[in-house]
Structures are given as C-alpha cells and as structure tokens.
Amino acid sequence: MFNIVLYAPEIPANTGNIGRTCVVTGAHLHLVEPLGFSLDDKTVRRAGLGYWQNLDVTTYAGWEDFLARNGLSPADGHLHLLTKKARRTYAQSIYRDGDYLVFGSESSGIPEPLLAAAPERCERIPMLRDCDSLDNAEAWEAHEESLGHTEDSHETILQQDICGNFVNPDDYRISALNLSNSAAIVLYEALRQTGFPGM
C-alpha cells in the first residue's frame, strides 16, 4: 500500500479529490496540519463523493508528529518529496510498497528546511517553464524585462513547489500543476512500477 502525504493542504476540493484517488487505489491519506479547512467542510466531502467514508485517513499535529507516528526519519528512504526544486524526476525514482509520496501546500509547497534535510529524496514532475507553456509567453517575457528581471531572477521566481495552484494576477504564468493531478501522476507511476497490486 502506498501513502499520500499532504503537508498543510489549503484547498478542500483538492484534498477531497485526492481522497477519492486513495480509495480507488488502496492508498492511505496522511494530512499534516495545519489544514486550511475543516475535514467536515462540504467541499471536501463533495469532491470525495460517496468514497469519503471508505477513506483510510490520518491527521497529524505537524511534520515531527507524522515522522514519529510512522517510524520515519527526515531523510528516510521511503519518503518521496515532490517539488519543482528537484533535479531528479519522479520517473527516475524507484517506488516500493509502503512508500510515502509527500506533497506540499498549494501556495508554497514543502517548506525549504524539509527539502534541505533530504535533498536526495526530492523529485519533480517535468513540465515546461511557466512562460513557455502559455500562449502569451512573449508577453510574460516582456513583462519580466520591464520589471528588470534577468534570466536568473526569473528562475528564482519559478522556484515554487510542484503542488502550487495559486496564480498571482500580476504574473502572466501558470505556477504549477494542480495538487490532485500531481498526486495522481506520481501515485500511478508508483503503482505501475509495483505491478498494480490487487487491481
């Protein structure tokens, strides 16, 4: 069984959708506080539809509580930290039964100290640079130039987690994939590598 870990999720519909994915794949959902919503929120349950009552879900007071209750160390080999800041892609990783796929909050991702404690556990989902993925890429690049940003500063701006959803209306770019899409992509790769057990 695989484990999906959401560190400080903010959008209830994303958590509901991920919960539904966990039910149909037999994965365990771990929610690390603080949460940006109540688990009683109608939006969470609506997104999870009739699956929510069958969900195997555990909530934790924080990252240390999550590690302690699951017998993990910060750089444990069973952890896979999904972030845009990684060099290695998720497809280059080897997944084993019992692994934990960790995704950060929609607005800021996994906190820097957690990534810095385990750089070898960091993975990313490959995607186009934000400005290259839009029809208005030229407008974005012109906007960057008007702000005096160099290529280096643009790369710094792009350093957001793979799970980012929020788009600054002053920016002409997409921040990243939706959290529930990201979780499904990586979970199904892990299931593929292990032969889709029980499916």
Region locations from a protein language model:
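Post-transcriptional modification and biogenesis factors for structured RNAs
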Residues: 1-199
